[in-house]
């Protein structure tokens, strides 16, 4: 793959995923899973599961404190816009660090989901615009 192709692919991925997601997280894998049930239109679809891990960069260090990597928090599931008739689930792993000055576990905070949901902020806004509220039905979850 040429550098230009890599650049175009990255630009495309930035348009597909939630805003700024690829700035802080890197794609580590994906898989497609078949869903045996049919949707309300009688079409069998699948689910695209995308794995992302936070880049190794603690964003809010306190001056004079030192931080040591300490693995990852449990992956969070975030529902995003369907892609090619497939439900999209983002499995997002955030890093954690130990503040060696205080001994506390710390991590970066991101607004990845709309409040009270497991939907990406943009997807929840779209659903709210379409339905007047965010529906609690399985075709979107």
Predicted regions and their residues:
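Intrinsically disordered, low-complexity segments enriched in small/polar residues
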Residues: 27, 40, 44, 62, ...
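N-terminal juxtadomain amphipathic helix
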Residues: 46-93, 98
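N-terminal alpha-helical interaction blocks
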Residues: 1-58
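Short, flexible coil/linker segments at or flanking structured domains
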Residues: 1, 5, 9, 13-18, ...
């Amino acid at each position: 793959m040429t550098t230009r192709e890599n650049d175009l692919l990255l630009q495309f991925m930035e348009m597909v995923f939630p805003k700024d997601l690829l700035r802080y997280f890197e794609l580590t894998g994906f898989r497609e899973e078949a869903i045996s049930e049919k949707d309300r239109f009688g079409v069998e679809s699948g689910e695209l599961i995308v794995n992302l891990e936070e880049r190794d960069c603690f964003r809010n260090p306190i001056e004079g404190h030192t931080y040591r990597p300490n693995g990852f928090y449990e992956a969070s599931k975030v529902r995003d816009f369907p892609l090619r008739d497939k439900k999209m689930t983002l499995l997002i792993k955030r890093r954690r660090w130990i503040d060696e000055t205080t001994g506390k576990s710390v991590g970066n905070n991101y607004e990845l989901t709309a409040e009270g949901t497991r939907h990406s902020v943009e997807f929840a806004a779209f659903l709210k615009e379409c339905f007047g509220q965010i529906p609690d039905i399985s075709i979107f979850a």
